[in-house]
């Protein structure tokens, strides 16, 4: 996993929103594109190449933050591919949601990035705890909207 702190970006109100984002994709090119997006948006991010690694990073980062009161979620957003080896994105999402519940953490916003476009796939993702469902190829503008950008 790679951590890259970047400078916060100012919102129009003058306040700073500097979200932490977990980028998850087993495809090196797709992951690199997500990193480019994160850098352009001045996001603080971590990378994972499968759902298990993503869940382990999420847990590890949460435990580092466990001294805060109330406990804070380790990431504001997770951009999660769904079709990955070791552990798929839906299983990882379920584990993250269970962990958040167990630890009393505020839920992060999980965005599915997938080539699976059927209505059933979208229902399965929603039931697993996915907040936003984007079908590949995904444009940077679509991801930016999730972060509140235009």
Locations of the language-model features?
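C-terminal compact regulatory domains
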Residues: 1-150
